[in-house]
Curated annotation (Swiss-Prot):
Signal peptide: none annotated. The lineage of its organism: Bacteria, Pseudomonadati, Pseudomonadota, Alphaproteobacteria, Hyphomicrobiales. Belongs to the universal ribosomal protein uS19 family. SUPFAM superfamilies: Ribosomal protein S19. GO terms for molecular function: rRNA binding; structural constituent of ribosome. This is Small ribosomal subunit protein uS19. The gene is rpsS. Keywords: Ribonucleoprotein, Ribosomal protein, RNA-binding, rRNA-binding. It comes from Bartonella quintana (strain Toulouse). NCBIfam families: rpsS_bact.
């Protein structure tokens, strides 16, 4: 279900402060975050966030196409190893 327009996008409060601090310092460092549920805002474009996937932080460089999406969409939590190979086809 989509969030109501009148509520606006959800972003954890500490995230705005961290992004502003990095942007004002001028250094392009990875901002470690655990908030996968936060929406990517236009002021985050050009910054790199380390989004936690449950095991480690995955670096995500924010571009304009990502605005409006959630951080969690860009850091997969599950590893896909593929389906099991067909044993008959493997023997030939």
């Amino acid at each position: 279900m989509v969030r109501s327009v009148w509520k606006g996008p959800f972003v954890d409060g500490y995230l705005l402060g961290k992004a502003e601090k990095v942007r004002s310092s001028g250094r392009n460092e990875v901002i470690k975050i655990w908030s996968r549920r936060s929406t990517i805002l236009p002021q985050f474009v050009g910054l790199t966030f380390g989004v936690h996937n449950g095991n480690k932080h995955i670096p995500v460089s924010v571009s304009e196409e990502m605005v409006g999406h959630k951080f969690g969409e860009f850091a997969p939590t599950r590893t896909y190893y593929g389906h099991g190979a067909d044993k008959k086809a493997k023997r030939k």
